[in-house]
């Protein structure tokens, strides 16, 4: 799957979890929108979620994920695993093309349609076409500065926007 037009980054530091997403929506080689909102709070404001991929598919997955959060009493780990199971086995859901990045104060997960629920080894994760750039910048800043999680997300997303042509610098940031 190729996900153009998206960079989503999450960083956790000092009890703060911050997620940022760029605002660019690209169709082929054309920028259709520059201020899309790809990051939001779910689960009564305790969970951050961002997406890479088809907007309509992501909205469906956000709805399903929020239902799983309610079903499992806000347990992010259980909700992520159960969504991944449904996504992989449901005939309609498995056609959806997106990746989800979800986080709360304790956990970060990347959820994919082929049943993967990936928990990163450290306190940062990213998805989308600019994800590798944002993640590399965030890891360097985590290891070599005392910046806050929010400052790291802002700087790393700016760097990704300078490198990835499918990422802009209209960044939406949410934190828990």
Curated annotation (Swiss-Prot):
Residues 1-5 form a propeptide. The active site is at residue 6. Keywords: Allosteric enzyme, Cytoplasm, Hydrolase, Metal-binding, Protease, Sodium, Threonine protease. GO terms for cellular component: cytoplasm; HslUV protease complex; proteasome core complex. It is found in: Cytoplasm. PROSITE patterns: PROTEASOME_BETA_2. Transmembrane segments: none annotated. It is an enzyme of class 3 (hydrolase). Na(+) binds at residues 161, 164, 167. Allosterically activated by HslU binding. The keyword Hydrolase applies. It comes from the Bacteria. It catalyses: ATP-dependent cleavage of peptide bonds with broad specificity. InterPro entries: ATP-dep_Prtase_HsIV_su, Ntn_hydrolases_N, Proteasome_sua/b, Proteasome_suB-type. Its EC number is 3.4.25.2. GO terms for molecular function: metal ion binding; threonine-type endopeptidase activity. One of its GO terms (biological process) is proteolysis involved in protein catabolic process. Belongs to the peptidase T1B family. HslV subfamily. A double ring-shaped homohexamer of HslV is capped on each side by a ring-shaped HslU homohexamer. The assembly of the HslU/HslV complex is dependent on binding of ATP. Protease subunit of a proteasome-like degradation complex believed to be a general protein degrading machinery. This is ATP-dependent protease subunit HslV. It comes from Thermotoga maritima (strain ATCC 43589 / DSM 3109 / JCM 10099 / NBRC 100826 / MSB8).
């Amino acid at each position: 799957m190729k996900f153009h037009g998206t960079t989503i980054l999450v960083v956790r530091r000092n009890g703060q979890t911050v997620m940022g997403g760029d605002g660019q929506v690209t169709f082929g080689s054309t920028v259709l929108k520059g201020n899309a909102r790809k990051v939001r709070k779910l689960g009564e404001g305790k969970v951050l979620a961002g997406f890479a991929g088809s907007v309509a598919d992501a909205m469906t997955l956000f709805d399903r994920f929020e239902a799983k959060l309610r079903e499992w009493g806000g347990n992010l780990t259980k909700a992520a695993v159960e969504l991944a199971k449904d996504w992989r086995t449901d005939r309609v859901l498995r056609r959806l093309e997106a990746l989800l990045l979800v986080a709360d104060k304790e956990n970060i997960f990347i959820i994919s349609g082929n049943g993967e629920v990936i928990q990163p080894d450290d306190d940062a994760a990213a998805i989308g076409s600019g994800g590798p750039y944002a993640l590399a910048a965030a890891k360097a800043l985590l290891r070599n500065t005392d910046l806050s999680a929010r400052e790291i997300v802002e700087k790393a997303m700016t760097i990704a926007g300078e490198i990835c042509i499918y990422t802009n610098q209209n960044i939406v940031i949410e934190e828990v």
